[in-house]
Amino acid sequence: MRKRSRMLLMLLMLCCMVFGTMHASAADELLGTVVDGSLLTDGTEVSYTVTPKARGTYLASGTGNLGLTAYRKLNMSGSTSCYQAVDKVKVTLYLQRLVNGSWVNVTTLGPKTDYNDYYVYTSNTYSVAGGYYYRVYGGHGAIEGSVSEAQTSYSDGFWVS
């Protein structure tokens, strides 16, 4: 009985070592590559700031942030800024993970809309599965009367064990 318990324990340890190495290898294999515009990093936080290519009348900038706050917990936040108060200012964020070479949506935060304001911010924390690269993709918009301005962007990605 004792010999059998030791054998099972050794087998379990061997499995943990093999599968743990496989996850690290998957991360290492892609580290430093660019997938759909996002650099895959070994950090624990990524962000972006986007400004319209042509200066708009209302939309000034948008930001998106994604950070590892605890074991498999990601905080996603973002904002949209306008040059002046507008009828509607909004931000929508998408938490994405890399699956078989493509970014797929995990969850959506927003749209968060403020009225008669120049700034909007939103934030939330999510539990995620390990073994993937994650990034934040965001949409930012301003509406004043019949004028609508919008911009999208995305961050780099980082590995969650």
Feature roles, as predicted:
Residues V99-S102, E144-S146:
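Solvent-exposed strand-loop boundary residues in beta-sheet-rich modules
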Residues G145-S161:
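Short beta-strand elements
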Residues L68-R72, L98-G101, S127-Y134, S161:
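A short, structured loop/turn motif at beta-sheet edges
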Residues G56-L95:
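Short, surface-exposed binding/anchoring microloops in extracellular/periplasmic proteins
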Residues M1-G67:
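N-terminal prepro-regions of secreted/extracellular proteins
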Residues Y132-V147:
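Enriched for extracellular/lumenal, surface-exposed ectodomains of secreted and cell-surface proteins
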Residues Y118-V128:
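Exposed aromatic-hydrophobic patches
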Residues L93, S102-D117:
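Solvent-exposed serine/threonine-rich low-complexity stretches and specific carbohydrate-binding patches
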